[in-house]
Amino acid sequence: MAEYCTQEENQTIDLISNLYLNNIIELIIDGNKINDTFTEYTFNSIGIHKVYFLFNLSGLTSTQDMFRGLSNIISINFTSLFNIENINSMEYMFANSRNLTFVNISNFNGKNLSSIKFMFLYCGLLNSVDFSNFNAPELIYADSLFQECHYLEYVNFTNFNAPKLKYMRQMFFICISLKSIDLSSLSTEDDTILEETFYNCWSMKYLNLKNFKHKLIGNLHNHILAGCYNLTYIDISSFTGEIPNIILLITETLPSEGEIVLKLDFYNLIRDQIPKGWNITLV
């Protein structure tokens, strides 16, 4: 069963919040503008498989929890009308949608967006996400963004713009199928929180953090790469901090061979700790 829902001239689309949607397989939503009540748990139904958006979100300030817990949803399709310029929070937006496999959020302009924490938390079958050309100049929080997305293999971060991003705790925590991550388009400052960011991503072979100016002091290595035993390429050439923490970061992670990009001054101090099978590129 499919449902086509339009926004009439004197009506608001928030009436969907009150629909009993258990028998609807596909939901197509058309309209010009959505009001601010169209948000938390709006689609919290066990029946929907696909949602198509043909409307403007400029009336919303949050999409928090919008698709949370949709147990049968497989795909969500956004058109160019999906405007998130006024959205400040997308926390838990797709969390616990355990059969969701595909989401394309490329080319989104989230100029007021500050948090995407837990956005895909426990989306167990999610395979790939396209974040390319995602513009979020005010984004600060991305903690647990993909936590325990066990089937996630690829995330496209090409031209991902988030210059103020600071909190990345457990961002890819136990993403055991993730093959590679290239975050070279993202530049962070030395106070970025990377606690357990890639913890137990044991399938990951390629990791590029070229422009991460992360400072390792005290206990701030925090198992960033713990359990990433299959890495064969890693660029942490902008990392700074105390040498013992650099050593721990590397030695708790690296397998017997691969390629690593490091600062020359770090290499001179820790070269005896790097496995002999590794090729070193110095910058």
Feature-to-residue mapping (PLM):
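Negatively charged
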Residues: 1-283
